[in-house]
Amino acid sequence: MEGFDHVTFWVGNALQAATYYIARFGFQNLAYSGLETGNRQFATHVIHQNNIIMAFTSPLTGDNKDYADHMMRHGDGVKDIAFNVKDVQHIYDEAVKAGAQSVKEPHQIKDEHGIVTLATIMSPYGETTHTFVDRSQYKGAFLPGFTYKVASDPLSNITEPVGLNLIDHVVSNHADKMMEPVVQWYEKVLQFHRFWSVDDKTIHTEYSSLRSVVVADKSEKVKLPINEPANGIRKSQIQEYVDFYNGAGVQHIALKTDNIIDAISKLRSRGVSFLTVPKTYYTSLREKLQHSSLEIKEDLDTLEKLHILIDYDDKGYLLQIFTNNVEDKPTVFFEIIQRNNHDGFGAGNFKSLFEAIERQQETRGNL
């Protein structure tokens, strides 16, 4: 696989959802499909920022059962995670042979910009799907059937680019005892491998805990952390998600940047809200760093001011921060991450992250 191609959300109002991410996260309009392009079933607004592409889809009629069932059960959420691949037919054939449920067989769509080959299978959880995309013979910005004559957002003329570059990983949450079957599906069907894992002995707070396995494709350009709750005194944030999403689904999307301080400063100025981190986290961090040979290039006072978390080992470090939920329900949120020679997933920050989310769970009456 060549990486993530795009992520598709099914939402109640595609125009308004896309506009939110344009205004708050600094995305730009990329493409549109709807009545004006001959699509009588769905309106889809596609936005982008550097190599990140997100599509938001809503139906144009009230008789689409799949959409109605999805919204009745889940509400707004990620419907499809698409991968950029070189050989759609081969990956699809191997996946179906290994037990994947086909949604749409390999097919080509074309316009004046060229040809795109696509195929879709069900993922191992919920109604979420995976689409394989080969755009090697396509010069357009997204897909045939879309118009690229879309308005530039006025905010882009008065605000600076945020600097989010690509999708680093996509995280899904599952009910207890469901993580391992999902991991095994990715190993068997897509030939992914186990890249990283933690269990409840490592990741726990006073009240709750989790288990997580990250699976990756052969190139390790696609990474999918898979979480499940573990037994605790109270309800974990993983179980809270499963309860409110009414099943397994995508919990958060991590967006990679090369300058997290600049990106978070701009996102905050745009109105994005983030989880807060207590001062004790940074006091403890400074003490630990005194006994480490690792040099953090960024100013710790600035990281503390912005509530950015740090995880590190002897070779490098990562900086990460998590938005508050972007839906009314405690389901989807985003992570902003900067990697400095570090391929981990912030295991050292899981406890702090869990405690921050638990403080919010308590205000929601869900802890």
Curated annotation (Swiss-Prot):
It comes from the Eukaryota. Binds 1 Fe cation per subunit. Gene3D superfamilies: 2,3-Dihydroxybiphenyl 1,2-Dioxygenase, domain 1. It is an enzyme of class 1 (oxidoreductase). It catalyses: 3-(4-hydroxyphenyl)pyruvate + O2 = homogentisate + CO2. One of its GO terms (cellular component) is phagocytic vesicle. Its cofactor is Fe cation. The keyword Ribosomal protein does not apply. Keywords: Dioxygenase, Iron, Metal-binding, Oxidoreductase, Phenylalanine catabolism, Repeat, Tyrosine catabolism. Pathway: Amino-acid degradation; L-phenylalanine degradation; acetoacetate and fumarate from L-phenylalanine: step 3/6. PANTHER family: 4-HYDROXYPHENYLPYRUVATE DIOXYGENASE. Key enzyme in the degradation of tyrosine. Belongs to the 4HPPD family. This is 4-hydroxyphenylpyruvate dioxygenase. It comes from Dictyostelium discoideum (Social amoeba).
